[in-house]
Each structure stands twice: as C-alpha cells, then as structure tokens.
C-alpha cells in the first residue's frame, strides 16, 4: 500500500511540474491507475499503469526486467485503444519507506526515479501469471518526457 501511494505521489509531482492534471479513473478495469491530461490541448491525454520495485536484481545495466502481471500486460499492449497507455515503474532505494525521501528545510528529495515504456507493439503471450517487460533506463519519467508523450498524442 505504501509503495502504491508513494508511486502515485511521484507521478503527481511530475505532472504538476509539467503543467498537466492527473486523476484516478472512477473504475480501474483496464489497468489504468491515472489519466494524465493537458488542459490547454484537445485530445491530449494518456493513461498510465504505475508499478514500483525495490528489487535491485530487476535493474540491469541499461534496462529493468519487470515482472508485469498478465492482466496488466494484456490491458496495456496493442494499438486498438483511443488513449495511449504507458507503464511507469518507480525504482525505490529499498523496501523501507523511511529511505524513500530525504527532507531538509531547503528541499524534499524523492530518491531514485521512475521509467516508462509503451507496450503498444508487444505480442500476445502464452504466459499465464506474468510477463517480464524490458523497461529502458533511457526512458526516465521526467516532466520533459511526459510533455513529449502528451505531444505525440495530440499530433
């Protein structure tokens, strides 16, 4: 529960800096945790599934091997959706919530960072429990990256 709430707060912070709004859908039946919108551009919305991990064994030299539940995988893949969908994975320093932030009178740091990937072009699988998704470490989830994802949507 704490990882989920922290991950959602992280995405909210990125959205705020980027100038976008985000909201939890009233029903989560399609693996979308948050809808992110740009209020000043029509048709500029994406949906995101947010996961987190403190397991350093998932993190490789240039990517994260994240075991995504099969339902989430199937909901996020494919191009037959009106709103693009992305997986965001927040890497945490460890499982202890006290290690996730560093606060001083001058700053509040959320430690480590999140990465994004589109599963749009991923293939069907015979897996029944989960699918290991490769998330590039070059896809850092930043305000600039989010603006780019939203811009792609509104073209």
What are these regions (language model features)?
Residues 1-30, 36-155:
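Mixed-charge (Asp/Glu-Lys/Arg
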């Amino acid at each position: 529960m704490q990882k989920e709430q922290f991950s959602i707060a992280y995405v909210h912070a990125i959205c705020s800096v980027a100038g976008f709004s985000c909201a939890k859908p009233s029903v989560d039946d399609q693996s979308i945790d948050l809808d992110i919108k740009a209020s000043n551009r029509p048709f500029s919305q994406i949906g995101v599934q947010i996961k987190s991990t403190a397991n350093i064994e998932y993190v490789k030299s240039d990517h994260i091997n994240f075991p995504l539940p099969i339902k989430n995988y199937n909901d996020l893949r494919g191009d037959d959706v009106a709103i693009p969908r992305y997986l965001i994975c927040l890497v945490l320093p460890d499982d202890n919530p006290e290690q996730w932030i560093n606060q001083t009178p001058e700053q509040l740091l959320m430690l480590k960072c999140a990465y994004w990937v589109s599963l749009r072009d991923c293939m069907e699988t015979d897996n029944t429990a989960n699918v290991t998704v490769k998330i590039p470490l070059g896809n850092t989830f930043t305000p600039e990256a989010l603006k780019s994802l939203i811009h792609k949507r509104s073209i």
